[in-house]
């Protein structure tokens, strides 16, 4: 239980106050007294607005429930449905065309298309790994994954396998040949490099010299011009660095002495305070904010044991090169960092208002993450994040333009209070709620001078799709959801609206996560669809995945693809409004229904047991088939809402849900048997984690927007209090 201090009619935890005084505010132009005064003013101005917006969500949901109880949804005639949605301010008429006017946006967001990581900022090691994933080893990414098959004695063995290594090198040099074509020969023929007259010379094994077919793709080197240690190339605004060292174990086996090829990989990273973390009280929030502070000041470090030795991880410095004209320049050694705040729903006990009520957690996040980011605006350390002087905040789970405007007003008030130039704080809008999707243009309009990002999120968006239309009928099995008309329309609509509003060359249009971190070959084969769709960033589950996905952006210049897509017909809103109802639910056999239920329950339990008992908000959780999937609250939301929907419409019974939960709890216990910190759910089935999972399924219909946070927070707090 936190101890509090009081000033300006609010209470704040001692630990948060000490953190401010001793760590956050030194070096900034604001005192601790001024900060808490501002906090009190912000709470007075915005807490009631926050509450009113949540009440509006409830009112709209009740109206939709009542409409479905009294009307049949006709997918072939949506006029009555749309008229109803307009009558309750769910669907808003679009205004005139406009383009966003956001200024001072870093090129990593405005220009450079590439992979994006999302990582729990609560975990310092993960956060540092992600920040340092701007550059990744192509050799390592290929060697350590299923990108290279293990046939013909090319297995991943304990020691280096030269047969596998040869396959890796062949793949990598084919990549170079494809995107950095030589005037003559192949990179497999190169024996050495040199720089002469501002040009890259490649010496071949037939004693001839060739050059790049497009000489402008050579942009720098390290070492001497006669014998460079590395060669820097560029394609589609992305850099590739060839590392040369004939004394290296790998370089010694390569005729050109190439020891590795580095790809510019995770161009941007979202440091997450939301779905991938489990932060329920003041102590947890302090951990979140302290790591964000370390990233913004550039001094975050983490020590851990790896392979029997102590590793000290910290932020990578910028990379130094010599240009072809022999001038010196630097490239960032780190991914450009954004920070995702929480949404509007939850409160936190770290700060209490004058009535001793917990304040909205989203307000707390905005105050602290923006104040902390002032350290980066000073640009006084070698690890500066934004070269353009901006602070990038991703805001999730907003329902419509009024909520986007609320957040923009909040940012404006905090800028004023912290002496930050107007519109320094940018907003990334997660398009993951149905009311935001159908009003996306108007959501962007109210943020047109701040917006730098829109992103689709299939999982949360499906959770809201199910919850919004809960009374319409049973939905299709989860495995069929991606084949429904609404989902493809939603993905294309996001791109269409973004381009219509002038995002090209100014802001990111993003796509969602690849959920299987061990299935890299499948990712490589499938994820080209994201740049092809016009998205200039897409989420990946690891730095390795970022390096592999980066190759897709060499294959396609997204800005060219966006130019093509600008001329296509915009998606019909009616397609987005097609509710994914199961037309043949009565024909599903009992085995199919049971398998669907078991799959959902296993996924819920596998995630919730770590969340509640260990405070782990994001992890690789084995599914019912023992395939590791990246799970966060979004995956939990869709699974729990799917069970709740089928339960509500009598496709399954409460007794069947309980039986499945108990059966799957035993499987999850077995899957986690190797974890010494794991607390089994069976055979008692009455612990906080099991209770949370069961509540999420059985009470899912009554959860606000189908969110998992209220139940998860409640049970985690109970667990921590023991």
Say what each PLM segment does.
Residues 2, 80-83, 87-406, 413-420, ...:
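Catalytic alpha/beta active-site cores
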Residues 2-92, 100:
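N-terminal-proximal low-complexity accessory segments that begin disordered
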Residues 2-12, 359-368, 385, 392, ...:
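Catalytic or ion-translocation cores adjacent to nucleophile or general acid/base/metal-coordination motifs
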Residues 6, 10, 25, 50, ...:
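Hydrophobic alpha-helical scaffolding
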Residues 11, 15, 19, 30, ...:
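Generic recognition of stable, solvent-exposed alpha-helical segments in well-folded globular domains
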Residues 15, 19, 23, 38, ...:
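Generic, well-ordered alpha-helical scaffold segments in large soluble proteins
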Residues 25-30, 45-52, 66-74, 90-94, ...:
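Intrinsically disordered or highly flexible coil/loop and linker segments, enriched in small
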Residues 82-86, 90-140, 149-157, 161, ...:
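Acidic, glycine-enriched catalytic cores built around paired aspartates
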